[in-house]
Protein backbone atom coordinates (compact mmCIF):
# COMPACT_ATOMS: atom_id res chain seq x y z
CA UNK A 1 0.00 0.00 0.00
CA UNK A 2 2.57 2.53 -1.02
CA UNK A 3 1.38 5.99 -1.81
CA UNK A 4 3.92 6.46 -4.55
CA UNK A 5 5.67 9.35 -2.83
CA UNK A 6 8.43 7.59 -0.94
CA UNK A 7 11.54 5.95 -2.36
CA UNK A 8 11.46 2.24 -1.64
CA UNK A 9 14.63 1.08 -3.39
CA UNK A 10 18.06 2.59 -3.33
CA UNK A 11 18.27 2.54 -7.13
CA UNK A 12 18.52 6.31 -7.23
CA UNK A 13 20.61 7.54 -10.15
CA UNK A 14 21.67 11.03 -11.08
CA UNK A 15 19.67 12.68 -13.84
CA UNK A 16 21.41 13.08 -17.19
CA UNK A 17 20.85 16.21 -19.22
CA UNK A 18 19.69 15.97 -22.82
CA UNK A 19 22.89 17.72 -23.84
CA UNK A 20 24.95 14.97 -22.21
CA UNK A 21 22.80 12.26 -23.81
CA UNK A 22 23.34 13.81 -27.24
CA UNK A 23 27.03 14.45 -26.60
CA UNK A 24 26.65 18.21 -26.96
CA UNK A 25 28.09 21.16 -25.09
CA UNK A 26 25.32 23.66 -25.87
CA UNK A 27 22.17 23.46 -23.69
CA UNK A 28 19.36 21.47 -25.32
CA UNK A 29 16.89 22.39 -22.58
CA UNK A 30 17.43 26.11 -23.07
CA UNK A 31 16.98 25.82 -26.85
CA UNK A 32 13.77 23.84 -26.25
CA UNK A 33 12.48 26.53 -23.91
CA UNK A 34 13.32 29.28 -26.42
CA UNK A 35 11.57 27.37 -29.21
CA UNK A 36 8.44 27.05 -27.07
CA UNK A 37 8.44 30.67 -25.89
CA UNK A 38 9.26 32.09 -29.33
CA UNK A 39 5.86 31.17 -30.81
CA UNK A 40 7.45 29.54 -33.86
CA UNK A 41 4.88 26.73 -33.73
CA UNK A 42 2.11 25.50 -31.44
CA UNK A 43 4.05 22.36 -30.57
CA UNK A 44 7.74 21.51 -30.52
CA UNK A 45 8.89 17.92 -30.91
CA UNK A 46 11.48 16.35 -28.64
CA UNK A 47 14.06 15.91 -31.41
CA UNK A 48 13.89 19.45 -32.79
CA UNK A 49 15.85 21.19 -30.03
CA UNK A 50 18.52 18.47 -30.08
CA UNK A 51 18.98 18.87 -33.84
CA UNK A 52 18.98 22.68 -33.69
CA UNK A 53 21.46 22.65 -30.81
CA UNK A 54 23.82 20.36 -32.71
CA UNK A 55 23.65 22.64 -35.77
CA UNK A 56 24.37 25.73 -33.65
CA UNK A 57 27.27 24.01 -31.92
CA UNK A 58 28.75 22.87 -35.24
CA UNK A 59 28.52 26.34 -36.82
CA UNK A 60 30.05 27.95 -33.74
CA UNK A 61 32.92 25.47 -33.68
CA UNK A 62 33.56 26.00 -37.40
CA UNK A 63 33.64 29.80 -37.11
CA UNK A 64 35.81 29.73 -33.99
CA UNK A 65 38.30 27.35 -35.60
CA UNK A 66 38.69 29.59 -38.65
CA UNK A 67 38.86 32.72 -36.47
CA UNK A 68 41.53 31.08 -34.31
CA UNK A 69 43.55 30.35 -37.45
CA UNK A 70 43.17 34.00 -38.51
CA UNK A 71 44.31 35.17 -35.06
CA UNK A 72 47.34 32.87 -35.19
CA UNK A 73 48.20 34.14 -38.70
CA UNK A 74 48.23 37.67 -37.25
CA UNK A 75 50.40 36.48 -34.32
CA UNK A 76 47.65 37.15 -31.77
CA UNK A 77 46.46 34.89 -28.98
CA UNK A 78 43.02 36.46 -28.58
CA UNK A 79 40.20 36.35 -31.13
CA UNK A 80 38.82 39.81 -31.91
CA UNK A 81 35.94 40.79 -34.23
CA UNK A 82 38.42 41.41 -37.05
CA UNK A 83 39.45 37.75 -36.93
CA UNK A 84 35.80 36.67 -37.08
CA UNK A 85 35.26 38.92 -40.09
CA UNK A 86 38.31 37.54 -41.90
CA UNK A 87 37.30 33.96 -41.12
CA UNK A 88 33.73 34.36 -42.35
CA UNK A 89 34.49 36.39 -45.49
CA UNK A 90 37.33 34.12 -46.63
CA UNK A 91 35.16 30.98 -46.36
CA UNK A 92 32.81 30.63 -49.33
CA UNK A 93 29.97 28.79 -47.54
CA UNK A 94 30.05 30.90 -44.37
CA UNK A 95 30.16 34.07 -46.46
CA UNK A 96 27.06 32.91 -48.33
CA UNK A 97 25.29 32.06 -45.06
CA UNK A 98 26.26 35.31 -43.31
CA UNK A 99 26.41 37.54 -46.38
CA UNK A 100 24.05 40.20 -45.04
CA UNK A 101 25.47 40.19 -41.52
CA UNK A 102 27.49 43.17 -40.32
CA UNK A 103 30.17 42.42 -37.73
CA UNK A 104 30.89 45.43 -35.54
CA UNK A 105 34.58 46.42 -35.55
CA UNK A 106 35.19 43.80 -38.23
CA UNK A 107 36.66 46.02 -40.92
CA UNK A 108 36.81 45.00 -44.57
CA UNK A 109 38.75 42.42 -46.56
CA UNK A 110 41.99 43.74 -48.01
CA UNK A 111 41.47 44.09 -51.75
CA UNK A 112 43.35 46.21 -54.30
CA UNK A 113 41.87 46.42 -57.79
CA UNK A 114 44.14 45.05 -60.53
CA UNK A 115 44.17 48.31 -62.48
CA UNK A 116 45.65 50.13 -59.47
CA UNK A 117 48.58 47.73 -59.09
CA UNK A 118 51.86 48.56 -60.85
CA UNK A 119 52.16 46.86 -64.22
CA UNK A 120 54.58 43.97 -64.65
CA UNK A 121 56.41 45.79 -67.46
CA UNK A 122 57.39 48.69 -65.20
CA UNK A 123 58.58 46.27 -62.50
CA UNK A 124 60.87 44.43 -64.96
CA UNK A 125 62.20 47.68 -66.39
CA UNK A 126 62.98 49.06 -62.94
CA UNK A 127 64.97 45.97 -61.99
CA UNK A 128 67.00 46.07 -65.21
CA UNK A 129 67.99 49.71 -64.72
CA UNK A 130 69.84 48.92 -61.50
UniProtKB/Swiss-Prot annotation:
Annotated localization: Nucleus; Chromosome
Region (Disordered): 1-21
List of residues that carry N6-acetyllysine: 5, 7
GO molecular function, one term: DNA binding
GO cellular component, one term: nucleosome
Role description: Core component of nucleosome which plays a central role in DNA double strand break (DSB) repair. Nucleosomes wrap and compact DNA into chromatin, limiting DNA accessibility to the cellular machineries which require DNA as a template. Histones thereby play a central role in transcription regulation, DNA repair, DNA replication and chromosomal stability. DNA accessibility is regulated via a complex set of post-translational modifications of histones, also called histone code, and nucleosome remodeling.
Name of the protein in its database record: Histone H2A.1
Organism listed in the record: Meyerozyma guilliermondii (strain ATCC 6260 / CBS 566 / DSM 6381 / JCM 1539 / NBRC 10279 / NRRL Y-324)
Amino acid sequence: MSGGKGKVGSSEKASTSRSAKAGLTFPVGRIHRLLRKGNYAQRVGSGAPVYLTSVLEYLTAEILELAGNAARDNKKSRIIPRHLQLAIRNDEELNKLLGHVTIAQGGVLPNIHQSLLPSKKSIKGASQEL
